[in-house]
Amino acid sequence: MKKIKIGLMGSAGRMGQEIAGVIEANPRCELVYAPLRGEKWDSKKAQAVDVWIDFTSPEALKDILKKASETKTPVVCGTTGFSKKEKELLKTYSKKIPVLWSSNMSLGVAVLNEALKAFSAISHFDFQIEEIHHNRKKDRPSGTAITLQENLEKAVDKKLPEALAIRGGGVFGVHKIFAMSDEEVLTFEHTALNRTVFAKGSVQAAEWLVKQKPGLYQIRDVLFGKSKK
């Protein structure tokens, strides 16, 4: 069986190290290139990559997409904190190569986002999203909370209060959605127990993305197929 050759951007970070470990344990994949910041670009190694996984920074996005498009290599991007302009870059390059970007690579969160569609039946309820992360997380609310908010507002067809963001300790990630009426409270909750959940989701996304045509994809597409718009 031919292994999928993965290139990893951001391998020195916590998530990068976790992803490298997941790739090593996966019999279907192998890590062939993990360039470090400031290191000279190795075109020969880059040519061998079947799919990139990127967990770096918004500032690095343009260069990564440019290099990937030169070799027609798909990109799985789990970086968050993108500006509107940077999100447009994802769309632009997805016309040339397959690009999968999600604010959260957890398969459970993908299912949670899909489940939010059911809230359209109780759109008259009050809603609130709450998220908790470790005290080192810079963006607040988190990219995951913003995505949940966007999908929830789409489902219930109204503007909702901004997500409550709590920072403390070493929490990997807790996201709660409250739906409240005078008579009842419905709570959806997702808790990440470790970083491995995001690493496994990223590698599964990479295995899926190598078979896709150019386009902009999300982690939910790995589970449910490309949504029609």
Swiss-Prot record:
<keyword id="KW-0457">Lysine biosynthesis</keyword>
<feature type="binding site">
    <location>
        <begin position="102"/>
        <end position="105"/>
    </location>
    <ligand>
        <name>NAD(+)</name>
    </ligand>
</feature>
<keyword id="KW-0963">Cytoplasm</keyword>
<keyword id="KW-0521">NADP</keyword>
<dbReference type="InterPro" id="IPR022663">
    <property type="entry name" value="DapB_C"/>
</dbReference>
<dbReference type="GO" id="GO:0051287">
    <property type="term" value="F:NAD binding"/>
</dbReference>
<dbReference type="GO" id="GO:0050661">
    <property type="term" value="F:NADP binding"/>
</dbReference>
<comment type="similarity">
    <text>Belongs to the DapB family.</text>
</comment>
<dbReference type="InterPro" id="IPR036291">
    <property type="entry name" value="NAD(P)-bd_dom_sf"/>
</dbReference>
<feature type="binding site">
    <location>
        <begin position="78"/>
        <end position="80"/>
    </location>
    <ligand>
        <name>NAD(+)</name>
    </ligand>
</feature>
<comment type="function">
    <text>Catalyzes the conversion of 4-hydroxy-tetrahydrodipicolinate (HTPA) to tetrahydrodipicolinate.</text>
</comment>
<dbReference type="GO" id="GO:0019877">
    <property type="term" value="P:diaminopimelate biosynthetic process"/>
</dbReference>
<dbReference type="InterPro" id="IPR023940">
    <property type="entry name" value="DHDPR_bac"/>
</dbReference>
<dbReference type="InterPro" id="IPR000846">
    <property type="entry name" value="DapB_N"/>
</dbReference>
<dbReference type="Pfam" id="PF01113">
    <property type="entry name" value="DapB_N"/>
</dbReference>
<keyword id="KW-0028">Amino-acid biosynthesis</keyword>
<dbReference type="GO" id="GO:0016726">
    <property type="term" value="F:oxidoreductase activity, acting on CH or CH2 groups, NAD or NADP as acceptor"/>
</dbReference>
<feature type="binding site">
    <location>
        <begin position="143"/>
        <end position="144"/>
    </location>
    <ligand>
        <name>(S)-2,3,4,5-tetrahydrodipicolinate</name>
    </ligand>
</feature>
<feature type="binding site">
    <location>
        <begin position="10"/>
        <end position="15"/>
    </location>
    <ligand>
        <name>NAD(+)</name>
    </ligand>
</feature>
<dbReference type="Pfam" id="PF05173">
    <property type="entry name" value="DapB_C"/>
</dbReference>
<comment type="pathway">
    <text>Amino-acid biosynthesis; L-lysine biosynthesis via DAP pathway; (S)-tetrahydrodipicolinate from L-aspartate: step 4/4.</text>
</comment>
<protein>
    <recommendedName>
        <fullName>4-hydroxy-tetrahydrodipicolinate reductase</fullName>
        <ecNumber>1.17.1.8</ecNumber>
    </recommendedName>
</protein>
<keyword id="KW-0560">Oxidoreductase</keyword>
<dbReference type="GO" id="GO:0008839">
    <property type="term" value="F:4-hydroxy-tetrahydrodipicolinate reductase"/>
</dbReference>
<feature type="active site" description="Proton donor/acceptor">
    <location>
        <position position="133"/>
    </location>
</feature>
<keyword id="KW-0220">Diaminopimelate biosynthesis</keyword>
<feature type="active site" description="Proton donor">
    <location>
        <position position="137"/>
    </location>
</feature>
<keyword id="KW-0520">NAD</keyword>
<dbReference type="GO" id="GO:0005829">
    <property type="term" value="C:cytosol"/>
</dbReference>
<feature type="binding site">
    <location>
        <position position="134"/>
    </location>
    <ligand>
        <name>(S)-2,3,4,5-tetrahydrodipicolinate</name>
    </ligand>
</feature>
<dbReference type="GO" id="GO:0009089">
    <property type="term" value="P:lysine biosynthetic process via diaminopimelate"/>
</dbReference>
